[in-house]
């Protein structure tokens, strides 16, 4: 379980009033903010901070890990004829933008091989 804490007493003066996320299971702390000596998001073993006292800070959201399986879907709403015409006459389609592997790209900036690959993968005869 993750607990938000504010350090109220420590041998290291820079730790006073700093905020951390404490992971009891891993015995680690993630720095939220500190005066000096620790960077934001730095993860340290609990033992590194030495003897400390703290007060718990309520967290609004409990972090969770969720694995979806790594699938994604690119949607291009175009006709095959439009892309084929863009290959033959790129000057007619200077603003044609498509989605490729999660990012947007101008169709005319792709190499001819990449353009053919997009057309082949986007328009199939059957599943």
From Swiss-Prot:
Listed name of the protein: Autonomous glycyl radical cofactor
Keywords attached to this entry: Organic radical
Pfam entry (one): Gly_radical
PROSITE patterns, alphabetized: GLY_RADICAL_1, GLY_RADICAL_2
NCBIfam families: spare_glycyl
Residue span, Glycine radical domain: 5-127
GO cellular component terms attached to this protein's record: cytosol
InterPro entries: Auton_GlycylRad_Cofactor, Form_AcTrfase_GR_CS, Gly_radical, Glycyl_radical_cofactor_GrcA
MF-aspect GO terms: formate C-acetyltransferase activity
Positions bearing Glycine radical: 102
Function as written in the Swiss-Prot or TrEMBL entry: Acts as a radical domain for damaged PFL and possibly other radical proteins.
């Amino acid at each position: 379980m993750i607990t938000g804490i504010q350090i109220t007493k420590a041998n290291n003066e820079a730790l006073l009033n700093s905020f951390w996320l404490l992971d009891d299971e891993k015995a680690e702390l993630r720095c939220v903010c500190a005066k000096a000596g620790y960077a934001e998001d730095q993860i340290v073993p609990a033992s590194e901070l030495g003897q400390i006292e703290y007060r718990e800070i309520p967290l609004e959201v409990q972090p969770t890990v969720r694995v979806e399986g790594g699938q994604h879907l690119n949607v291009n709403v175009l006709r095959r004829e439009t892309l084929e015409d863009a290959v033959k006459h790129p000057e007619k389609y200077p603003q044609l933008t498509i989605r490729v592997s999660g990012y947007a790209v101008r169709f005319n900036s792709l190499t001819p091989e990449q353009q053919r690959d997009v057309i082949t993968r986007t328009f199939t005869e059957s599943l």
